[in-house]
Amino acid sequence: MLDRAFEALNPDQGVIYLKQPTGEHHRAAERSVDGLAHEHLESATLLKKVAEEGLTAHVCGLDADPEWKSAESMLDQGVKSLIAVPLTDSQGPLGMIAMTSLSSRSPFGDRELEMLVSVASVASLRIRNLILTEEAVRRSLEVDQIDRELKLARKIQVGLLPSGVPEVEGFELHGCSAPCRHVSGDYYQIVPRRDGKELLVMVADVVGKGLGASLLTASLEALAAGPIEVGRSPVEICDRVGRRLHDRTTTGKFATMFIASLNGGEGKLTFANAGQSPGLLIGANGRAMRLKATGPPLGLFLNTDYSESSRRMALGDLLVVYTDGLTEAADSEDREYGLRRLTLVCKNHRDKPLKEVAQAVERDIGEFARGHPYEDDRTLVLVRRTH
């Protein structure tokens, strides 16, 4: 991982620190350009800001930045600019990856930061995978191999999903996901951006079910992390993820995705829908609008021009984003639940707390299916503008 990042970003020095069970950080890997006097990149200031506090560092002109005047070890080494990204997932911090330059002309721009965020996301997934694998080996030596793999995959996937919804001024939020097997091909994220002034909502559904689908879901999460972190728009995220997913997967592997950014001050909703079931925008007056696809599924074609659309969310309006596991839930006679019934339930409960809206949807699907087993994963994200 460090070598790949080093070759792509051309720094003078790079390092990966990993958090130990004791809470200390161990230098797991490092690299310097040929001919550079080898000095370990050690900075308590950098570790505190990035590895412990989870902040992304992008500094040009380190010696002139008062925020970094305490980073004496790096200043003594002649470091002029740096980018550093935390290694983390929903279960907590894992460490950090950092790149530095001795040149007064910084080689690190937004593109390089985005690349490092993507590398960190993939690295975090692999590190957590290794940690969970070690735990599984220690605790489950007598468990069947297939069962161990499924449980491990489930833990990884739960780690990808939000552990809770963030609190964002101006919005009420709720998200939930249920697999039809041990592991799921559904994925969602709710991410505050631009200092809490913007909210990004993403719901994705990869082709297939079970272990293979969950691994593809993990790849999708890693590919989307960088563009989301640096503030890309919904259509830009679709473009970038679609191309990279096509390059990294075999024929027939793809994902659908609904992604939207919401501005709390203006109430502006901007969305791109890559082959996903239409989202619903239900007004406070009960009128429902379908937010249909603006492009094909991600990874299906190499060159695809996605588009995005905008709507205004008035006070009390409800955004409903879901995967087709809800609308395609079937009863014993193979009749599907359908979008019309989902819309009706959401309209009838639109003034309720969002957790109660989600419970009403799940209850109504259960009454419709009457015990018939679910054939697909089910994910539902609800967003209401409150002020």
For each feature predicted by the language model, list its residue ranges.
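Amphipathic alpha-helical "output/dimerization" segments
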Residues: E42, L46, D89, P107-R128, ...
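A short, aliphatic-rich beta-strand micro-motif
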Residues: K80-D89, G95
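Amphipathic coiled-coil signal-relay and dimerization helices
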Residues: Y17-L18, G23-R31, L269-N273, M289-A293
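Regulatory sensory and allosteric helical modules in signal-transduction proteins
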Residues: H26, G35-S70, L75
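Regulatory loop-to-helix N-cap segments in sensory/regulatory domains
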Residues: E39, L94-V119, K209, S307-S310, ...
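Short loop/turn motifs at secondary-structure junctions and domain boundaries
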Residues: D65, S73-V79, P107, T251
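Signal-transmission/dimerization alpha-helices at domain junctions
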Residues: E52-T56, S90-P93, E114-R139, A222-V230, ...
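… and, occasionally, acidic/histidine-rich disordered N-termini of signaling adaptors
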Residues: D12, V137-V320, G371-H387
